[in-house]
Regions:
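Conserved donor NDP-sugar-binding/catalytic core segment of glycosyltransferases
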Residues: 71, 75-118
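Alpha-helical elements of Rossmann-like donor-binding domains used by nucleotide-donor carbohydrate transfer enzymes
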Residues: 20-27, 49, 53, 76-83
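Glycine-rich, basic loop-to-helix element that forms the pyrophosphate-binding segment
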Residues: 42-58
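Short, flexible, basic/aromatic active-site loop/helix in glycosyltransferases
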Residues: 113-136
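N-proximal low-complexity "stem/linker" segments adjacent to membrane-targeting elements
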Residues: 1-28, 33-38
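Preference for well-ordered, secondary-structure-rich cores of eukaryotic proteins
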Residues: 40-41, 71
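Short aromatic/hydrophobic "clamp" motif used to bind/position activated sugar donors
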Residues: 63
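Active-site acidic Asp-centered loop
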Residues: 66-68
Length: 136
């Protein structure tokens, strides 16, 4: 069975499904045909097993794997991701943030080769690092 290559399936594993997080993901992808598969997993399955389950159940060719602590700040993600794959059909995978050269094994140590935006919360304070304009 051929899957849909013009839409996106989002696969998320979480210990407890949070409807506000689900709504946030839905808003950021903001396309009526974006499929969001959120699996509640208290540790009985590995993350790989959950992602493989999502791959089997998804209806789209383009699949996004997300951790449940990832907060997206770019909206309208579905058409942006689809356009990126259309522009670069040779791509098999796209990363939102990372580095294109890794020598130490710690991605954050080689700042000149980093791209994207990474945010995190430490001791209740939000931190956002902008490494480049990124693809979105």
């Amino acid at each position: 069975m051929s899957k849909n290559n013009e839409m996106v399936s989002v696969i998320i594993s979480t210990r407890k499904i949070d409807s506000s997080y689900y709504d946030h993901v839905k808003r950021m992808f903001s396309h009526p045909n974006t499929e969001i598969l959120m699996y509640e997993n208290d540790g009985e399955m590995s993350l790989t097993q959950i992602y493989n389950k999502g791959l089997k159940e998804s209806v789209n060719d383009i699949v996004v794997f997300m951790h449940d602590d990832l907060i997206l700040e770019t909206s309208n993600m579905t058409p942006k991701i689809v356009k990126l794959f259309e522009k670069h059909p040779e791509y098999g995978i796209i990363g939102i943030a990372g580095t294109d050269k890794l020598t130490s094994g710690m991605w954050w140590q080689n700042r000149e080769n980093m791209f994207g935006v990474v945010g995190h919360i430490h001791e209740g304070k939000r931190h956002v690092n902008h490494y480049s304009k990124g693809v979105f």
